[in-house]
Every structure is written in structure tokens, then in C-alpha cells.
UniProtKB/Swiss-Prot annotation:
The species this protein was found in: Methanosarcina mazei (strain ATCC BAA-159 / DSM 3647 / Goe1 / Go1 / JCM 11833 / OCM 88) (Methanosarcina frisia)
Protein name in UniProt: Trimethylamine methyltransferase MttB1
Reaction it catalyzes: Co(I)-[trimethylamine-specific corrinoid protein] + trimethylamine + H(+) = methyl-Co(III)-[trimethylamine-specific corrinoid protein] + dimethylamine
Pfam families: MTTB
Pathway where it operates: One-carbon metabolism; methanogenesis from trimethylamine
Keywords, in A-Z order: Methanogenesis, Methyltransferase, Pyrrolysine, Transferase
Length: 495
């Protein structure tokens, strides 16, 4: 037959793809954003950041702390920001490429304050502690569809007792060999994070810059403010060579316009202001275009993350990031359910598919429940399957000489089956194959113990925590890393 190389999907991304906007609509959002960056501008609460903006031609009001950012500076920043960078793991097999229009990746949710604990079919919620971070890191190290690790919960047992955020840096880095993304960094402590990473590299700061095993996330304050902490995380991250994620958490109808397009404008202004600051600090600094923006439920008084609007906003942000040539990090695989139940499965699938189909580079939300307040290890294991099936859907239906299978059809002929065909046997792993989601008939399922999905997930959690082995760190290096934590604790306690 005649050769063809048609591939499902279109444009730069292979497979199934969701297109939300025309180029003119993306330009309309951009130009509306440029108007907002000049009027009313961005409130920049950090004096050092205001000085950086001022030295680069921005109008700065020192009475109101408002900075007006002209379009030419934004365009220059977008030209300087890399469209591709690598997140290194302690084990390089976990290295992850973040690239505008590139492959879709997943990470766990962060940062919650409670754990949903499974107890013989019942659930209780308790405050999260440092050991939970270690356990989740180990679970994510095992989970094949979690590409890198984000801080999932707070070490609330350390709060008020020591340098909590520094513990929240050390514990993940030592309990998974995957890249660690700190979702709750403290600007004044970034030097400690740097020192922990440098200690891992034997004091070689240049190697730490070249192979970043650590990155940070910061959130502008909606609407239209960069806090002192956000600015310091951006500035220090850029100076220390750490990838920085500028992620807006606007709430449509609350801290941003009720119209989603208007919310994208304020969201865009906040993120571009942070990205511009990073590039003015260190040209070429690695940055994500981030989003955890959702709606404000005007009837319930909550900010739902399992809503169709969150999926649409995250998909929209992915398209904006591609428009600017930046990697996108967005909320997805999220749920408002309190336990791993039917609601969680429905919401996570919906909020996973929409931004994934739009080509977001990273979706974060795996393991999350209760509007982002709670983390469940059983849910993470279930989400690992949801993500695996989503990845299969993203492949679409490739059409080429091999997949059209004309020779196979002719060989099998009429009324026969393809089970014994060599091609079928060779591709036994071609169909989707979830680990826990059950595809057996009722009788076989009952004979195996009639376990529901959450019970099966709990068994897997217990097995992984008992048997999975994380790549260890050399004892002397580990000692040096821990010494940084001890130093931070002493400083916190005034010793």
C-alpha cells in the first residue's frame, strides 16, 4: 500500500489535543494584560524588587509601592526566559524536561495541612507531620506516573519548634531520588535550601546550578500584588540557579473577575510581573508559568478545585504559556471530595484530562482531597492509575502503514480472530493496563476478596512503605546536609 505518516492530532503536539483559543483571542488576553500592568500596575511590597524594577525603567510609586511595568520589559523578559530546562533527580533516570509545548508530566499535590488516614474501610483526618512527608516521598518514588515530587503537606509538628520549611526541604530530598519542588518556601531561608543542595553536591555550587535537584514555587497575592516573600523567592531563586514557579491562585468572582477571560487577564498580569522580575534579576533564569487559579463558589464560600472551571482555567493557562514560549505548571487531578470515593474519581479525571489535552507541562494534584486541604496516600495510588490511563488517551490514534494493519487483516480474513496473530502477542502491553483499577468480571473479583478500590490502594501503600527502597545518599554527604538543618533550627531558636 502507499506509505503515509499521518499522526493523530495537529500543530506541534502529537496525539489528542484541545485547542481553546484562536491566536487573536490569545493576543486580546495579552494586550488586556499589558493595559493592566500599566493601569493600575502591580503592588510590589519588597523594596529590593521595587529597586530592580525602577533601575530597569519602570515607574515606581514609593508611597503606594505600585510598579507600572511597560510592555517592552515584559517582551524582553519573555525573550530571555528559557523555553526548556531540565529538572534533575538524585537519580538521573528521573530527570524531567520542562518545555513549552512539550511532554505532559505529573507531580503530587501541595501543600495540605491534614492527612486522610485509611483505617479498615473508615477514614480519619489528622494534622500532617514530618514523617508523612517522608512516607509520601517514598510512595512517589515508587509511583511510575509521578514524574517529580512536590511538597505535599506541612510538617506541622515542627511548626514553632524549628525551621519548618528547612525540614520540609531536607526530608523530601532524602526520601526520594526524584526532583523536589518546594511549594511553600520562605524567602529569608532560601540560603539554607541552597546550602543543603550544595552539600549534596559535595560543596560544588557550580554543579548544583547545572543539575538542579531542587526548585521553588511562589504565589502572587491576588489581585495584583507581589509580596515580600514572593519577591525574595524569585530574586534568590534566580541568583542561585534554582528553577522558580510563579503561580497565581486567583479566585474568579473573589480575587479576580467573575468572567474567566477577565480572570485570565489578572492571572496573566501577576505571573508575568513575577517572571519579569526574575529575568531582570538574572537574564535567562529558569521559570514556569504557573496556575492554581479557580473559581470562588459564591454560594458555598469555598474555592473548589474539582470543578470544570478549574480544568478550563488550567487548560487556558497552558495555552497562554505556549503562546509565550514558557513551560506551564497547572493544577489538575484535583478534587473537593473528602475521601477516595466516586466524587474524587469523577473530579480528578475531569480536571486531569482538560489541561493534559491542552499540553500543560506539569499537572499537580495527585493525592489531594478536600479542596487542597488534605492528602491521602491511597488516593495517590489511585491517581497513579488515573494518570496512566490519561497518558494512554493522550496518544490518540496514530495512523501509519503499520497501524492500519492491512496485511494482518488480509491474513486473518473473514470471521476469524486476531488473538493468535504474532503481532497481537508481541503487543500484549499495547492496550491500557491500570495497576489497581479492576477489569475482572464480578465472579473473579468476588473470589479474590471483593475489595473496593480504596482497600486495594491501602494494601499497595502498606506494601510500598515496607518494601520499596529509595536510592540512598552517602553517609558523609547526608551528615553535611543534616548539619544545615541543625544550623537553621539553632537560628530559629535564637541559639
Amino acid at each position: 500500500m502507499a506509505k503515509c505518516n499521518a499522526v493523530a492530532g495537529f500543530n506541534a503536539l502529537n496525539g489528542v489535543q484541545l485547542n481553546l483559543f484562536t491566536t487573536d483571542e490569545l493576543k486580546a488576553i495579552h494586550y488586556a494584560t499589558m493595559e493592566v500592568l500599566m493601569d493600575p500596575g502591580i503592588q510590589v511590597s519588597d523594596p529590593e524588587a521595587r529597586q530592580i524594577f525602577k533601575e530597569n525603567g519602570c515607574e515606581v510609586n514609593e508611597q503606594t509601592n505600585v510598579v507600572k511595568i511597560p510592555e517592552y520589559l515584559v517582551r524582553r523578559a519573555l525573550q530571555l526566559a528559557p523555553s526548556r530546562f531540565v529538572l534533575w533527580g538524585r537519580d538521573k533516570k528521573y530527570n524531567t524536561v520542562q518545555e513549552a509545548g512539550g511532554k505532559v508530566h505529573w507531580t503530587c499535590f501541595g501543600t495540605g495541612v491534614k492527612m486522610c488516614k485509611y483505617q479498615e474501610g473508615k477514614y480519619v483526618t489528622v494534622d500532617s507531620v514530618e514523617q508523612d512527608i517522608a512516607d509520601i516521598a517514598k510512595l512517589c518514588d515508587w509511583a511510575e506516573n509521578i514524574d517529580y515530587f512536590s511538597l505535599p503537606v506541612s510538617a506541622r509538628d515542627i511548626a514553632g519548634q524549628g525551621a519548618q520549611d528547612v525540614h520540609e526541604t531536607f526530608t523530601p530530598l532524602t526520601n526520594t531520588a526524584k526532583h523536589f519542588h518546594h511549594i511553600d518556601p520562605v524567602g529569608e531561608n532560601v540560603e539554607y535550601y541552597r546550602d543543603i543542595v550544595n552539600a549534596y553536591y559535595g560543596g560544588d555550587e557550580e554543579e548544583a546550578r547545572k543539575k538542579p535537584i531542587f526548585s521553588m514555587l511562589l504565589c502572587p497575592t491576588s489581585p495584583l500584588e507581589l509580596s515580600v516573600n514572593a519577591c525574595q523567592v524569585i530574586i534568590k531563586g534566580a541568583r542561585f540557579g534554582m528553577p522558580v514557579n510563579v503561580l497565581s491562585m486567583a479566585m474568579s468572582g473573589g480575587s479576580s473577575p467573575v468572567y474567566l477571560a477577565g480572570t485570565l487577564v489578572t492571572h496573566n498580569a501577576e505571573v508575568l510581573a513575577g517572571i519579569t522580575l526574575a529575568q531582570l534579576t538574572v537574564p535567562g533564569a529558569k521559570v514556569w508559568y504557573g496556575s492554581s487559579t479557580t473559581t470562588f463558589d459564591l454560594k458555598k464560600g469555598t474555592a473548589p478545585v474539582g470543578s470544570p472551571e478549574l480544568g478550563l482555567i488550567s487548560a487556558s493557562v497552558a495555552k497562554l504559556a505556549q503562546f509565550y514560549g514558557l513551560p506551564a505548571f497547572v493544577a489538575g487531578t484535583o478534587s473537593d471530595a473528602k475521601i477516595p470515593d466516586n466524587q474524587a474519581g469523577h473530579e480528578k479525571t475531569m480536571t486531569c484530562l482538560l489541561p493534559a489535552l491542552a499540553g500543560a507541562n506539569t499537572l499537580y494534584g495527585a493525592g489531594m482531597l478536600e479542596l487542597g486541604m488534605t492528602f491521602s496516600m491511597e488516593q495517590l495510588v489511585i491517581d497513579n492509575d488515573i494518570i496512566k490511563m490519561t497518558k494512554k488517551a493522550l496518544q490518540g490514534v496514530p495512523v501509519n502503514e503499520e497501524t492500519l494493519a492491512v496485511e494482518s487483516i488480509q491474513k486473518v480474513g473473514i470471521g476469524n480472530n486476531f488473538l493468535a496473530l504474532k503481532q497481537t502477542r508481541q503487543l500484549v502491553n499495547y492496550p491500557s493496563d491500570p495497576m489497581l483499577i479492576d477489569r475482572r468480571m464480578f465472579g473473579d473479583w468476588a473470589a479474590a476478596g471483593s475489595k473496593d478500590l480504596a482497600a486495594a490502594a491501602h494494601e499497595k501503600v502498606v506494601d510500598v512503605l515496607k518494601n520499596h527502597v529509595v536510592k540512598p545518599i552517602d553517609a558523609d554527604i547526608l551528615k553535611d546536609m543534616k548539619a544545615v538543618v541543625d544550623k537553621a533550627d539553632k537560628a530559629f531558636r535564637g541559639m
